[in-house]
């Protein structure tokens, strides 16, 4: 496996299976994440941090360069993470020309919930048992220093919170004041509740059920 491929794959807790594909170009060994990337699918299955943000931004930019008119799909199962990493991914999602479908499976919590809501309107989805959690941003670790330093940190937390609220308000249609009140504490939403809230547009049916009723 070359280094370029390894950079776009989240860390797995077990060895991913590889498989062989035959085509007119010959035989190629692949793995699930490479195959998803070929299908223009990005999988966010880890915490949102600088490493995962860099990987996702790189994939978004490459997929746009390959075909700016084809949709990119981002599957999300993430506990959230850092605010600056979130905004780096968010800005890149808004920057690229391709529409971005977002799909939550498992959970989209904290920063990941903002990314879920930031998909192209009408193309934001969740599976039936997914959950979404929104809350105000915070700084990790113990904050120490002079009073003036603490004031700077407090101002930064307030700036981050206001930016998150206005971002969610933009994508959900909710008033920023409502967002602030709802995110004072953890607000946990089912898939249907996330739809009513404006974070997603559609709760997906299982493909098996859709095929049976067709």
Swiss-Prot record:
Principal subcellular localization: cytoplasm
One GO biological process term: protein quality control for misfolded or incompletely synthesized proteins
Subcellular location(s) of the protein: Cytoplasm
GO CC field: cytosol; endopeptidase Clp complex; peptidoglycan-based cell wall; plasma membrane
Catalytic activity: Hydrolysis of proteins to small peptides in the presence of ATP and magnesium. alpha-casein is the usual test substrate. In the absence of ATP, only oligopeptides shorter than five residues are hydrolyzed (such as succinyl-Leu-Tyr-|-NHMec, and Leu-Tyr-Leu-|-Tyr-Trp, in which cleavage of the -Tyr-|-Leu- and -Tyr-|-Trp bonds also occurs)
Top class in the EC scheme: hydrolase
Cytoplasm in keyword set: yes
Keywords from the named record: Cytoplasm, Hydrolase, Protease, Serine protease
Cell cycle as UniProt keyword: no
UniProt cross-references to InterPro entries, sorted A to Z: ClpP (IPR001907), ClpP/crotonase-like_dom_sf (IPR029045), ClpP/TepA (IPR023562), ClpP_His_AS (IPR033135), ClpP_Ser_AS (IPR018215)
GO molecular function: ATP-dependent peptidase activity; ATPase binding; serine-type endopeptidase activity
Residues of the active site: 110, 135
A Pfam cross-reference name: CLP_protease
Stored CDD domains: S14_ClpP_2
Physiological role: Cleaves peptides in various proteins in a process that requires ATP hydrolysis. Has a chymotrypsin-like activity. Plays a major role in the degradation of misfolded proteins. Degrades anti-sigma-D factor RsdA when present in a complex with ClpP1 and ClpX. Degrades anti-sigma-E factor RseA in the presence of ClpC1. Does not seem to act on anti-sigma-L factor RslA.
Subunit-level organization: Fourteen ClpP subunits assemble into 2 heptameric rings which stack back to back to give a disk-like structure with a central cavity, resembling the structure of eukaryotic proteasomes. Forms a complex with ClpP1 and ClpX.
Family per similarity comment: Belongs to the peptidase S14 family.
HAMAP family listed in its UniProt record: ClpP
Name of the molecule in the record: ATP-dependent Clp protease proteolytic subunit 2
UniProt lineage: Bacteria, Bacillati, Actinomycetota, Actinomycetes, Mycobacteriales
């Amino acid at each position: 496996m070359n280094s370029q491929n390894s950079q776009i794959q989240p860390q797995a807790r077990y060895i991913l299976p590889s498989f062989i594909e035959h085509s007119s170009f010959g035989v190629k060994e692949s793995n699930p994440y490479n195959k998803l990337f070929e299908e223009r699918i990005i999988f966010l299955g880890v915490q949102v941090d600088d490493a995962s943000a860099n990987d996702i931004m790189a994939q978004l930019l490459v997929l746009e360069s390959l075909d700016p008119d084809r949709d990119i799909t981002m599957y999300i199962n993430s506990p959230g993470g850092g605010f600056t990493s979130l905004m780096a991914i968010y800005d890149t999602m808004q920057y690229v020309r391709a529409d971005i479908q977002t799909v939550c499976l498992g959970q989209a919590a904290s920063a990941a919930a903002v990314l879920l809501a930031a998909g192209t309107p009408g193309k934001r989805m969740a599976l039936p048992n997914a959950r979404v959690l929104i809350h105000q941003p915070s700084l990790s670790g113990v904050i120490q220093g002079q009073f003036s330093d603490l004031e700077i940190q407090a101002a930064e937390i307030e700036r981050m919170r206001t930016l998150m609220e206005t971002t969610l308000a933009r994508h959900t249609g909710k008033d920023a004041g409502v967002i602030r009140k709802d995110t004072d504490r953890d607000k946990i939403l089912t898939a249907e509740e996330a739809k009513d809230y404006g974070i997603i547009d559609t709760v997906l049916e299982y493909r098996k059920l859709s095929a049976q009723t067709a």
